[in-house]
Curated annotation (Swiss-Prot):
The gene is US23. It is found in: Virion tegument. The lineage of its organism: Viruses, Duplodnaviria, Heunggongvirae, Peploviricota, Herviviricetes. This is Protein US23. The keyword Signal does not apply. It holds the Pfam family US22.
Amino acid sequence: MWRTRWEDGAPTFTRNDEFLYCHTRYETFLRVMGDFQGIFECQYSADVLRDWVRNHVDQVLSLGIPHNWFLQVRPGSTMPELRDQLLDDVICCPERLIVLGKCVIMVDDHYEETELVLCMGGGTRLYIYEPSQEILLLCARHLDELARYGMMYTEAVYRQPQTPFATRVPHDVVAMLLRHGHDTDALAACVGEHHGRDVNFHTPGRHAKTLKLLTSFGCLTDCWPFEVAPAARLAECEMYVTLQLRCRWYLLGAVGSYRAGGFFDTSFLIIFDRFCRFYVVIVKSHLDRSPPLQRLAGEIYRLADSLEELFRAGLMKVYVRRRYEHGLRRAARLERNGGCVHMGEAARLHFTMFDSGVDRDYARQFRWLCRGDRFRAEMLNNWDGWDAFTIWQARVVRGDFAERRRPRSLGDGEEEDEGNDGRAMPVVRRRPPPMPRDDDEDNHVVPDNQNLEVIHDALADDEEQGEDDDDSGAEPMEPEENNVVPNVDRRGGEDAVAARMAAGHESDDDEWEDLGFDLEEDTVFDLKDVDEWFEQRRLAEKERWHLGQRIVNAYRTEAEVSEAEVEARRINLNTDLSPEWVKSFDFREHFV
């Protein structure tokens, strides 16, 4: 079997669909790492890596998963399909890519060549270039990920006829669907014949979900949360999907799981257009994840180009975002935008962050990756991937990979200690202690009670004099600017507070800003204006509904249309689509 299933005794996660439950065995991991050891140790220079590729032409390297996939080393100069390609326009950020070779598949006793070209970027990032679609696929973030999970994340693998199907049960339903998978009307009729049947929908490396086959969009009233939606909202959801696809489409089924109460809880909808291209509609939002993994309700993007690819890959393109292509092409195909792996430190190998001394020692890093105690039989992942702090603890305890000693500062009567190699320990120079402040700048002065009595008497006299001045009505004289001498009081504590009060400083509570209106005045709305606003909104919603209904009817009744014309509609019209349509899929209040 090309993948390992760990279904017996697997731990229970909070969301079991978000965790891989399979990876390569330790023997397979060592085989992949051993084959790519020369490439791993040459990553410091692009020229050295190209020389390595030229010196190892036609050498076959294992790719792990699937077990019969290999890399045949070839330089890029021998591939004519790469001469006119500008990969900088495809990838999210400028990155130098070095061609390593082509992917081949072992069938019986010979290798069958594919069109997939394997390239390597910075930090041993591995990309797959597919010339037929002019796309780049992120195969692995680094070589360690390739050795552990192989090509499992690469969608191009599931377009090859040699890849086995992940979805097989029930056999009669799957065989019947695959038989009519290239004819839209025949496939829709086949789904209608098996209405309500459950398919064990598998995604490689993930736990299976239930795909409930449904005849039409109106049949969703038997599934949660659509059973609580009124008929008008259900029709609005159907119109929104049509306005996104810009052509006639059909419903394949709902993907979800059965709850304890017996009802079917829907997470995704799988639909296909008149050209047998399959898409997913997000029903349940997932906002508690990082931005590359967030899924918003109402999002629609392509899952597969055929039913065979859908039953091989499952929901792989829902879980990962690793496809890079031109922006217009992505909008035409309704593809999900790939996340950028060049910004965060997560794109690099996490174990290189703990010790800068081995940052360029790739031979030592390779030994660290291939150590014998990295994998444990009772775990579904390597222990340093679950708890990265154990890397630092292991290095401190063992001390066999890096040794760090801080220079010891010398005391007043100590001399430099010469080591065995004749090198002297560096002398650490300390700063001189700060100069003590004057007595008048000391903030911790003990207050004098006699001075406080004098200050309070002076304060009372100032208040009486201020009242007399107010009664007389005479304006106080302002001093000239040139003769003003700043009075700086350096006393602290209670003396400073009393001095400010004696000087007649106003408190901060008296300072306020004139906002130009009365805050205590009650806000009064004109009910006539409010009713007029609601009436305008109601008319706008009614106009949007009628316009959408006319467009949907035109798409449903058109006899012939090419796929290129439909893709042109998506590029030109989907950008102007009202955001009110996507709100029809907002069922957050019905999910727990």
